[in-house]
Amino acid sequence: MKLFALLVSITLCYSFPAPLQTNVSEPFGLLQKVSEQVIDPDYNIPEVKDAPAIPYDERNSPTHAYSVDISFHTTPSDMDCLRDQGYKSVFVRALNPIGNTYFDRNALNTINNAFEAGLGSEVYITPNINSTRSGADQISLVYQNLLANGINVRSIWIQVTSPTNWVAPMAVRIEFIQDMIRSAKNLGLSVGIYTSFYDWLEITGGWNTFSSDVFLWYWHVLSMGTDGETTPTLEDFRPFGPWRQATVKQFGQVEKLCGMIVNRNVYSTGNQHLSQIVHFSTHQENSSSEKKLIRVGGIGF
């Protein structure tokens, strides 16, 4: 079974490579994970187990759906497999925080593959507060690159995890996050934050004074792997920061699925809008034409 190069867990996407921590002294010790690790396709990792199958009676539930988050190259067959296993969407990383940050072109490939498989797509970014780019510039970098490559994004999720990566005074961190939220809204995007109670408290001090229309995608696992999964519902959510309800929950991390190592998520489907082709008029000199774009982003709308 092939395994891809990836960020093993979304909760630690831009620290330097580190060994797995086998002795976790407290519940959030799982933040000390492998990051940016290349996994040899022929290397057997016995501790990474196959993800449990989604029960058949939940694969077309009118109330909730399952998703995975991805930060690596995919193939059309990968997306077909996810669809056949009952998954409805993928969260795709579009900003790589390594160095000065750069647009992750793997996102284009995955969004197109997901669209062809009939899956929805959501875009998330892993920002870097130490980059010379401002928070607004990091949002703009992703937005402009997606648009230039035929992707019309409606919403964006901002990762706020791994406190050790946020090397700046707390006031600077808050302003950086606020700058990203403001920039995304100025571009007409809906905004979500990927975090947890612990991450949010450590990084922002529990900041709760921004707009309540920012969605929440929270993670809650007991440890990496299938044995560390929590229930695939949002019923364990407890209010923190400005949020009184959550939109998405990550309940499993570092699990084998369709030849990939992924994290698993669940979300309410009440208002979900799947990816679709949209048409835009483009007015050029002495002519008018139409441009087709894949529209992504719709969970929580």
Curated annotation (Swiss-Prot):
Residues 1-15 form the signal peptide. GO terms for molecular function: lysozyme activity. Coiled coil: none annotated. GO terms for biological process: cell wall macromolecule catabolic process; innate immune response; peptidoglycan catabolic process; signal transduction; stress response to copper ion. Keywords: Signal, Stress response. Transmembrane segments: none annotated. Disruption phenotype: RNAi-mediated knockdown results in partial sensitivity to Cu(2+) ions with less than 70% of animals reaching adulthood 4 days after egg laying. Plays a role in the stress response to heavy metals such as copper, probably in a kgb-1-dependent manner. Belongs to the glycosyl hydrolase 25 family. This is Lysozyme-like protein 3. It comes from Caenorhabditis elegans. The lineage of its organism: Eukaryota, Metazoa, Ecdysozoa, Nematoda, Chromadorea.
